[in-house]
Regions:
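Nuclease catalytic cores that cleave nucleic-acid phosphodiester bonds
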Residues: 1-2, 11, 17-23, 29-44, ...
Length: 181
């Protein structure tokens, strides 16, 4: 034998290898929303989500403003149930002379980037700054953007994961309203 430890060769202690889990990962139940902190921030890449979700993509094909409004409405419900701050970022960089603009629609902060600035660049800076004092989640379907925000300490949500979370919140909200009536 080339290498033998000082106390003899390594022995098999009868431990079984860990079981492989399937593709589904367990998620926390949304019945108990206590794991959400008030200083949580969700940053959403607006157009990326619109064109990743079939129902919003269909609306956007006819009317982009209506698709943006539908996303804001969905995020408003999500924010109300989760109690977190939501920042929705849209690209506005191709518009000549466009200053950065922000507005609050139904509690959701909506940001249009300034001329020459992409939503990705804005989200990277925002996640870095907010990450110093908040728990930040960034929702985007852009894999490169997900890697960048992970580097800043933010959590990432794919478009599919955000949709799943929003459906869970919607179901929780419907159940809550049903109990009240």
């Amino acid at each position: 034998e080339i290498f033998v430890r000082p106390r003899g060769p390594t022995k098999n202690r009868g431990m079984a290898p860990r079981a492989q889990t399937g593709g589904d990962t367990a998620r926390p139940a949304l019945d108990d929303l206590a794991y959400v902190q008030k200083d949580d921030v969700l940053v959403v890449d607006g157009y990326n989500i619109i064109f990743a979700w079939p129902e919003l993509k269909k609306i956007a094909a006819d009317n982009l403003d209506a698709a943006r409004a539908a996303l804001v409405h969905s995020l408003c419900n999500y924010q109300g149930m989760r109690g977190c701050r939501v920042i929705l970022v849209f690209d506005a960089y191709p518009m000549k002379g466009n200053p950065a603009a922000g507005d609050k629609e139904a509690g959701v902060e909506v940001v249009y980037t300034k001329e020459g600035e992409t939503a990705d660049a804005y989200i990277e800076k925002l996640s870095y700054e907010l990450g110093k004092s908040h728990r930040v989640k960034v929702a985007t379907g852009d894999a490169l953007e997900q890697i960048m925000v992970l580097g800043h300490g933010a959590q990432r949500l794919s478009a599919r994961e955000l949709k799943w979370e929003m459906e869970q919140v919607r179901g929780h909200m419907d159940g809550y309203l049903h109990k009240k009536s």
